[in-house]
Curated annotation (Swiss-Prot):
Protein name according to UniProt: Transcription-repair-coupling factor
Cross-referenced Pfam families: CarD_TRCF_RID (PF02559), DEAD (PF00270), Helicase_C (PF00271), MFD_D3 (PF21132), TRCF (PF03461), UvrB_inter (PF17757)
Repeat is among the record's keywords: no
Gene Ontology BP term (one): regulation of DNA-templated transcription
Taxonomic superkingdom: Bacteria
Domain Helicase ATP-binding intervals: 633-794
Sequence motif DEEQ box, residues: 747-750
SMART domains in UniProt: CarD_TRCF, DEXDc, HELICc, TRCF
Domain Helicase C-terminal: 808-969
Catalytic EC class: hydrolase
Gene: mfd
EC number, UniProt record: 3.6.4.-
Lineage: Bacteria, Bacillati, Bacillota, Bacilli, Bacillales
Residues where ATP binds: 646-653
Task of the protein: Couples transcription and DNA repair by recognizing RNA polymerase (RNAP) stalled at DNA lesions. Mediates ATP-dependent release of RNAP and its truncated transcript from the DNA, and recruitment of nucleotide excision repair machinery to the damaged site.
Length: 1168
């Protein structure tokens, strides 16, 4: 984009502006948003000061940020995102927005140069005093001394929470001399101390808990945007007490009790850990002299104001909203007199003393003394939308008028295509810049702005893809911390005390933790399990692979089995029978599929390539991989049967569209089968739009078509005139004949009835089939079905999707009104989820009184199919603002303009349901909002509380997501295998079920379970060998290490575990050293055919297998073991060698030496 700034820099108008910008009060008029951004960016580039750009709201700040990222390095661009809604202060904060705010405040506190975009609400917000913020900036360096207690105390002030193992943002832990911290910005950090000196600082991976790279120094940023010290708490106690006493007599008696509950809920007087998320509501009482953000800026900062009049309008409504919000919470006993979140001074007063540059599109009167007014003439660019003739004549005009023409396109490929298009129009163009650019020609460069503009006095025109092709600008995202899929899904397997488990031999019990028991003078760790009644079972940790976490459908509480009863055996036998039946079916399907002959497609055609380049977005890596897998299938003679699995809105349709186009290019027909009329309409419109420039005949068969049109479509399918048909189950009727059907695409197959599914099966025989589903299919289950259906998964969301901002709040009409008003004010729509059909119309009336001007519709499952579809369609077409609905919206319908979801009684929903419902919003490049409301002052059940806690963590794809994934996976398994199996999965738990199914399938296919290469070794030594709680306090971490030790088969793995223990928990004690010695002995034994090593008090017995006995070279063994002298004796029992070792002082070392000698004495067998 340097060409743009170079052209602007040389212009006289800009030079006039540059002289007064930041020097005196100036009004700049006439510039469109993108032209304005170009000027501001150039001013910033030429100065050494901080530049503050004030906007009226966050939406405007986001838009300007996207354009500014084209000119300014992301490292120097900051935003202070505050929502235009008071309710935010009362709910769980979004970590994304909070980390952006902290990044901004930290940069300002350090005096960094940067361009800072702040919406009005952010400018007025009460903040931590600047000096206090500066005192809590910490930079740690290797070699420095720290006062550990003081340091940990500071972390707590900064909003960090102490845990035994760090797994989420905002946590820290202390183990021995190791401190782990997961800051909001940057990588998780591990600090190792030598007494009080920092010995090393390392990044570490939260998933594996292993260190990565050493760093010399690290900045620790706060984990909350408020600092709360002990002094702050004691000031707050006094202020809040006074506020409570002032408020109590002035409110209605009926709510005084509520006020008391609110006052006590902050737990200021009995707690030691303070939740910053909750205390932020009391910011007005926290500090003696709170700051606003302007006090964080340098005294010579440059200030630019975007659209002064808009800011004043927003300020007025903000003041009114804030006043009514505060009065509402006071009147309902939820707040106190004196509570506020913003400074009420006028916006001009806040920036007094600074020279300000005001940007306004139109000349306007302002109550401000201005020193200069600079007028620009700026015109919008004609919208071409691909109309070649208009484009040519406009470009010709620019050339004739000797303009500098800058064309911005978003990818390198498009640069080449644009140049080819301009050369066809005989417009001179270049793509590489050499120093300067002569006028009267076009330069095509990679880049994007929200819109083009023409500055006639400068002789400059900028044209973007928006004018050329109606493309939306792609969101430029600053790098955010991505959470890997493994991390999302891994930890639902984590065992917590109280979880249900399944023991392969004993059935369903409860996990009570790891206990160290003394058995015959030695200490060992056992897993303690509770069964029916008072039965308890202690499982040695080295047999832990027989215990799995019980995972089944959400809210299914399993029945505990009785130890020693026959009930579990019967249950397993039943499941075994059903699993074998399924295995039988799967094998038949598999054989059938292998035999079937289908059509073999050729490589991609030139049209295919052109068609794919036409896609206005970048494919995600998962999309690209899925497309390749599908094309590979189509290019084989065996018919494709592939399942494409991806969350709603993750781009499955584009993948399907490309497959459809490939089929049509080879003269084949495509049937696109969907479960509902509305979905049919949406897919039909997508196909029409995507294929408009290609000779493809697309038709729709659904209730929205007249009988005459349906008849014509059937005729067209029969003659081959129709290439692609989209439709509901009408496509499955017997009287439809295709001339040459090549591809069947089925969307959400599980939503079709049994009869329709049968019909789909018959169509499948020698046609390629692609099935799309938004319900995730568990990989473990899929593995056991390998070869029956192939699976492609799209797990990455498209580039420009924002995470949905999720709030968990008490039900309150003023919160609801504010959320509705905010969405409608940005011309959006709202889903209002109310799951009680009997009173849903009353709810609509209630909302209508709240929002008299809104159009409100109702949708629920008891309406006729036709009425429901009409309502949904009207909502999609923007005829209604608010849709009051039951969970009927959970699947399928795409309403990109609906970006707010409000759910009443969210505590009654399952997590997976909430997760899928939340996927309804945030579907466009706008931020989506989800409000989960629960009744005020209602005592929640434990499950509901856990669930809401998990939903709060949804805001960062935390554990809530994992639980939802788990439940959805089970739902997916049920869809794949049928309803009856769902019940069986619930009786034995998901993991055991998958394992049984896999074994049954393999057995039927004649695949023997691979005999373990190395036989099981039993090592039983009278030693204290375990992981003491003093060394590893966290039980999950302990189990994880035991699992690794159990799986160890090589010395490299042992070294790796030793490294991990030292890295995560510091030097290990003698009990752990012995445990590692035993594992080392076991590895030698595995490699040499030893089957048993048993401690019998004074001697140790070692047994070899017959095969190992045949392979051992006796001579080599006797030579090697001479140092052991008479302590070792050799014998033979049942053709197998036995060795006894008499115990002496260093007997453990002797045993290690002996097993090593045995391994080294093995002859390498000829078969190897």
């Amino acid at each position: 984009m340097t060409i743009l700034t170079t052209l602007i820099k040389e212009d006289n108008h800009f030079q006039d502006l540059n002289q007064v910008f930041g020097q005196a009060n100036t009004l700049v008029t006439g510039l469109s948003p993108s032209a304005k951004v170009t000027m501001i960016a150039e001013k910033y580039a030429q100065s050494n000061q901080q530049l503050l750009l004030i906007t009226n709201n966050l939406y405007q700040a986001d838009k300007l940020e996207t354009d500014l990222l084209q000119f300014i390095d992301a490292e120097e661009l900051y935003k202070y995102p505050v929502q235009d809604i008071m309710t935010e202060e009362f709910s769980t904060q979004s970590p994304q927005l909070m980390s952006e705010r902290i990044r901004t405040l930290t940069a300002l506190a350090q005096g960094k140069k940067g361009l800072f975009i702040v919406p009005l609400n952010g400018l007025k917000k009460w903040l931590t005093p600047v000096e206090m913020w500066q005192n809590h900036q910490m930079t740690l360096r290797v070699g420095e001394d720290i006062d550990v207690d003081q340091f940990l105390n500071k972390l707590v002030n900064m909003g960090y929470k102490r845990e035994s193992v760090v797994s989420h943002i905002g946590e820290f832990s202390l183990r021995g001399g190791i401190i782990d911290i997961f800051p909001l910005i940057g990588e998780p950090i591990r600090i190792e101390l030598f007494d009080t000196e920092i010995d090393s600082i390392r990044d570490f991976d939260v998933e594996t808990q292993r260190s990565k790279d050493n760093v010399e120094e690290v900045d620790i940023t706060t984990a909350s945007d408020y600092i709360i010290t002990e002094e702050v708490i004691s000031h707050l106690k006094e202020e809040l007490k006074t506020a409570y006493e002032n408020t109590r007599p002035k409110i209605d008696k009926s709510v005084r009790n509520d006020l008391k509950e609110t006052y006590e809920s902050f737990k200021l007087f009995e707690s030691t850990y303070f939740d910053h998320q909750i205390l932020r509501r009391l910011v007005a009482f926290m500090y003696e002299t709170p700051s606003t953000i302007i006090e964080y800026f340098q005294k010579d900062a440059i200030i630019a104001v975007d659209e002064f009049n808009r800011i004043k309008e927003t300020e007025e409504s903000l003041t009114v909203e804030s006043d009514s919000f505060i009065s509402n919470i006071i009147e309902s006993g939820n707040g106190f007199i004196g509570q506020s979140f913003i400074k009420y001074d006028d916006f001009e007063t806040l920036i007094e003393g600074y020279p300000v540059t005001y940007f306004s599109l139109f000349a306007t009167t302002m109550p401000i003394k201005l020193n200069h007014i600079i007028k620009f003439s700026c015109k919008p660019v004609q919208q071409f939308y691909g109309q070649y003739d208009i484009m040519r004549s406009e470009f010709q005009r620019y050339v004739n008028q000797n303009y500098h023409i800058v064309v911005l396109v978003e990818t390198e490929t498009k640069v080449e295509r644009m140049q080819a298009m301009l050369s066809e129009m005989h417009i001179p163009s270049i793509t590489k810049l050499h120093r300067s650019m002569s006028s009267g020609q076009a330069v095509i460069i990679e880049g994007s702005l929200s819109e083009g503009f023409e500055l006639p006095d400068m002789g400059l025109v900028v044209i973007t893809e928006r004018e050329l092709f109606k493309s939306k600008q792609k969101k430029q995202r600053k790098r955010t911390k991505a959470i890997s899929n493994a991390e999302k899904i891994k930890s639902y397997q984590d065992l917590n005390v109280g979880d249900y488990i399944v023991h392969v031999h004993h059935g369903v019990g409860r996990y009570l933790g790891v206990e160290t028991l003394e058995v015959g003078q030695t200490h060992r760790d056992y897993i303690k399990l509770q069964y029916k009644g008072t039965d308890q079972l202690f499982v040695p940790v080295d047999q832990m692979d027989q215990v799995q976490k019980y995972v089944a459908s959400e809210d299914k509480t399993p029945k505990l089995n009785k130890l020693g009863g026959s009930e579990w055996k019967k249950t397993k036998a039943k499941v075994q029978q059903s699993v074998e039946d399924i295995a039988e079916e799967l094998i038949d399907l598999y054989k059938e599929r292998e035999m079937a002959e289908g059509y073999q497609y050729g490589e991609d055609t030139a049209e295919q390539t052109t068609f794919e380049l036409d896609f206005p977005y970048e494919l995600t890596p998962d999309q690209a991989k899925s497309i390749d897998e599908i094309k590979d299938d189509m290019q084989k003679s065996r018919p494709m049967d592939r399942l494409l699995c991806g969350d709603v809105g993750y781009g499955k349709t584009e993948v399907a569209v490309r497959a459809a186009f490939k089929a049509v290019m080879e003269g084949k027909q495509v049937a696109f089968l969907v479960p509902t009329t509305i979905l049919a309409q949406q897919h039909y419109e997508t196909l029409i739009e995507r294929m408009q420039d290609f000779p493809v005949e697309i038709q729709l068969m659904s209730r929205f078509r007249t009988p005459k049109e349906i008849k014509q479509t059937k005729e067209g399918l029969k003659t081959g005139f129709v290439d692609i048909v989209v439709g509901t189950h009408k496509l499955l009727s017997k009287d439809i004949q295709y001339k040459d059907l090549g591809l069947l695409i089925v969307d959400e197959e599980q939503r079709f009835g049994v009869r329709h599914k049968e019909r789909i099966k018959t169509l499948k025989h020698n046609v390629d089939v692609l099935t799309l589903t938004a319900t995730p299919i568990p990989r473990t289950l899929h593995m056991s079905m390998l070869g029956v259906r192939d699976l492609s998964v799209i797990e990455t969301p498209p580039e420009n999707r924002f995470p949905v901002q999720t709030y968990v709040l008490e039900q309150n009409m003023s919160f609801i009104k504010e959320a509705l008003e905010r969405e409608l004010s940005r011309d959006g729509q709202v889903f209002y989820l109310y799951n009680k059909v009997q009173s849903i119309y009353e709810k609509r009336e209630q909302l209508q009184m709240l929002m008299p001007d809104a159009n409100i519709a109702v949708a629920h499952g008891q309406m006729t199919e036709r009425d429901l579809e009409e309502t949904m369609l009207s909502f999609i077409n923007n005829e209604y603002d608010i849709l009051v609905t039951t969970t009927i919206i959970e699947t399928g319908v795409d309403v990109p303009n609906a970006n707010t979801l409000i759910i009443e009684d969210a505590d009654r929903f399952g997590l997976s349901q909430l997760y899928q419902l939340r996927g309804r919003v945030g579907r466009s490049s706008r931020i989506g909002y989800a409000y989960f409301l629960h009744p005020a002052n209602k005592v929640l059940t434990e499950t509901a509380e856990d669930r809401l806690q998990a939903i709060k963590e949804f805001t960062e794809l935390g554990s809530g997501f994992k639980i939802a994934m788990r439940d959805l996976n089970i739902r997916g398994a049920g869809n794949l295998l049928g309803k009856q199996q769902h019940g069986f999965i619930d009786t034995v738990g998901f993991d055991l079920y998958s394992q049984m199914l896999e074994e049954a399938v393999n057995e039927k296919r004649g695949i023997k379970e691979p005999e373990s290469e190395v036989p099981e070794v039993e090592v039983d030594l009278n030693l204290d060998a375990y992981l003491p709680t003093e060394y590893i306090a966290n039980e999950q971490a302990k189990i994880e290490i035991y699992k690794k030790l159990r799986k160890t088969e090589t010395f490299d793995q042992i070294i790796d575990i030793k490294d991990e223990l030292i890295d995560r928990f510091n030097d290990y004690p003698v009990e752990v050293a012995r445990l590692l010695d035993i594992v080392e002995i076991k590895v030698h034994a595995l490699h040499s055919g030893i089957t048993l090593i048993k401690d019998k008090g004074k001697i140790i017995d070692i047994h070899l297998s017959v095969k190992a006995t045949e392979n051992i070279d006796g001579e080599v063994l006797f030579k090697a073991t001479q140092p052991l002298g008479r302590t070792m004796k050799v014998g033979v029992q049942n053709n197998a060698m036995t060795i006894t070792l008499t115990k002496q002082n260093q007997w453990l070392d002797s045993l290690k030496f002996l097993v090593k000698c045995i391994e080294e004495s093995m002859r390498i067998s000829d078969e190897a």
